Structures are given as C-alpha cells and as structure tokens.
C-alpha cells in the first residue's frame, strides 16, 4: 500500500490548511530569524510568514490578533514607515484591528495582504507598480488598495516576482504590476499601475483559485478548467510551446480533468506549478530542471520520492509553516 505523504504547499506567504491542534506544533524555530524573539513572544505566535531573499523578514500575528514584524526591512517591506531594520518585534499599528486572512509576497519584496473583511493592503518594493497604488514609489506603510476593488471582497491573493493578483468572492481576478511577459493578462506588455480585471477567456467564468509564478499567472475556474497567461519561455504554462501568453488561455492538455487548486511552491523548481486533481494525484507544469519532468511543455503527473502525494486544500486562515528540510 502506498504511503500518503502530506505536502504543505504555498509560496511561503500562501496559507495552508491546519487545525487548532496543529497550530500548537508550529515550530517557528525552524527559521533562524525567530531566535531574535523571546520565549514569551514565541508562545504568543498564531500565524507566521517569513519572507525576503534570505528569510530576513517576518510578519506574524498573535493569539491576541495583533500583527508584529521583524527583520532587515528591505524597501520598507515591514510596513513600519521607514527602512530601518529591527531586531525586536514591532507591532504594525497601521493594521490594528485587522485580522489577516491571507498574504503573499514578491521578490522586491512587496507584500499583498487581505483581511478577513476582504480589504487589500500592500506595501514594500514598488518599482514596477506591483503595489497597485498608481505610483512607482516604495510603500513604507500598508496602503489600502480600493481602486476598482471598492465594492469587492477579496478572498485570495498571489504575488509573482513583481506583479500581484487578487481573487474576489464573486469569482473575478484583478491583476497589476510588472507586465513584460503579459503576466497581468491585459493583452499588452505595458506595466499595470492599478488593479485591472483579468477578462478575455475569464470574462464569464467563476474563478475559485489563483496562483503566480515568477512572471506568469494561473487561475482555476469552478468547472475545474485551468487558465494560464504570462511568461512561458520554459514551457511552464503547459500550452505545448514556449511563446508568452498575454491573455488567459485554457490548458487544453488538462481537458477532462477537474482541477481543484493550483500552486506555486518554493520547494519545487523555480518555474514549476502544481495542479491538484484529487487526493493522491497531481500534475505539474515545470521548466528545465533535472529529472523526468525537466523541460516539460505540457502537464505531467507528479510523484515524489516514489510516494503518493496529497496536496492539502488551502484555507485562508493560516500562513504557511516552515518547510522541513
């Protein structure tokens, strides 16, 4: 009988399903940055997201629903109003009273956070308008993004390197930021400074899940179809070629397969995406890496270490626990 191996997926800043009992086992000590926290502070942590190029920044929430940040603060990504590093946890007062539903981050890094009420806040690196506030100035404090989203409730967020996606409760996708390869889905390669609804083939579809790669984007609709757009120089869109796709395009190779969710996981190769078909079965879009799926231009089945992989459905309540090496 095959051993079922739970695989916690998500882009480090992506939420992962967990129960209250598993929260008690969240070992933040796996991340060196938490050595700067006292034992008392560690015991209060309820959710945590470590990000940055070297894992030198962290945002965490406490059992009292307070939000704290800590780290090098590159480009103001801690949201404290300055670019000074801090070796002591500092409360993010600008988000007082807000409960974190989900968050993601980019390479700058920039941070996109959705609250339990469906509001979107962004801050950090903004050279490519990835904050969605209409400027290219770095955001030193969380900025409420309401343009084209004022009457929308955001339920999921995703970040590429320098672009951002959000999913609303009515199944619409909005994108903004760097667009050199069409990853915003606007049909052009001009950067997008404010949220813009992704339409085209998604116009009359109800999207239930979104994900970003470095310079590409993916969406799953309620019928189980997968749509992709953006950079595909390594075949990561799964369309059978290596040409960029400036608007959403259905992945025909997945015809007849009902996909539940898609993922971009930092434990997978740089250009990889995983589509969850059902427990124990998955398909992967992947760029040129060693192994039997290297350079695949169309989806391939995924098996890790000879064991059946179960991709956990994401909740929007808990930020990812650390990968265990």
Indicate where each model-derived feature is located:
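Beta-strand-rich domains and repeat architectures in extracellular enzymes and scaffolds
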Residues: 40-65, 74, 110
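Conserved loop/turn at the beginning of each blade in beta-propeller domains
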Residues: 52, 82, 96, 104-105, ...
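Tandem repeat domain/solenoid detector
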Residues: 116-119, 140, 151-156, 163, ...
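Conserved strand-to-loop turn within each blade of WD40 beta-propeller repeats
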Residues: 63, 72-74, 107-108, 115-117, ...
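Short glycine/serine- and acidic-residue-enriched loop/turn motifs that recur at repeat junctions
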Residues: 2-39, 68-86, 125-139, 174, ...
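Conserved core positions of repeat-based scaffolds
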Residues: 56-60, 69, 109-113, 122, ...
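Surface loop/turn motifs at the tips and blade-to-blade linkers of beta-strand repeat domains
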Residues: 39-42, 49-51, 93-95, 104-105, ...
């Amino acid at each position: 009988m095959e051993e079922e191996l739970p695989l916690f997926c998500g882009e480090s800043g992506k939420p992962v399903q967990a129960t209250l009992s598993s929260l008690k086992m969240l070992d933040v000590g796996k991340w060196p940055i938490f050595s700067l926290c006292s034992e008392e502070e560690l015991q209060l942590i309820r959710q945590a997201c470590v990000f940055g190029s070297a894992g030198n920044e962290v945002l965490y929430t406490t059992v009292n629903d307070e939000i704290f940040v800590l780290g090098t603060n590159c480009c103001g990504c801690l949201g404290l109003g300055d670019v000074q590093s801090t070796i002591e946890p500092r409360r993010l007062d600008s988000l007082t009273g807000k409960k974190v539903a989900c968050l993601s981050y980019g390479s700058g890094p920039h941070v996109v956070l959705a609250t339990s009420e469906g509001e979107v806040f962004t801050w950090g690196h903004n050279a490519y308008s990835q904050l969605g506030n209409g400027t290219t100035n770095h955001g030193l404090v969380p900025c409420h993004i309401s343009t084209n989203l004022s009457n929308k409730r955001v339920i999921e967020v995703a970040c590429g390197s320098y672009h951002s996606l959000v999913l609303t409760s009515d199944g619409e996708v909005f994108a903004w930021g760097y667009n050199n390869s069409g990853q915003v889905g606007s049909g052009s390669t001009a950067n997008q400074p404010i949220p813009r609804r992704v339409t085209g083939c998604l116009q009359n579809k109800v999207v239930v899940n979104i994900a970003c790669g470095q310079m590409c984007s993916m969406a799953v609709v309620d019928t189980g179809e997968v749509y992709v757009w953006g950079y595909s120089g390594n075949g990561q869109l799964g369309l059978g070629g290596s040409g960029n796709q400036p608007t959403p395009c259905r992945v025909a190779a997945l015809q007849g397969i009902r996909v539940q969710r898609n993922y971009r996981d930092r434990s997978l190769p740089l250009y990889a995406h995983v589509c969850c078909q059902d427990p124990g079965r998955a398909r992967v879009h992947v760029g040129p890496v060693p192994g039997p799926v290297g350079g695949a231009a169309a989806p391939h089945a995924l098996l890790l270490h000879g064991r059946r992989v179960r991709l956990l459905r994401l909740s929007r309540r808990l930020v990812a626990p650390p990968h265990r090496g």
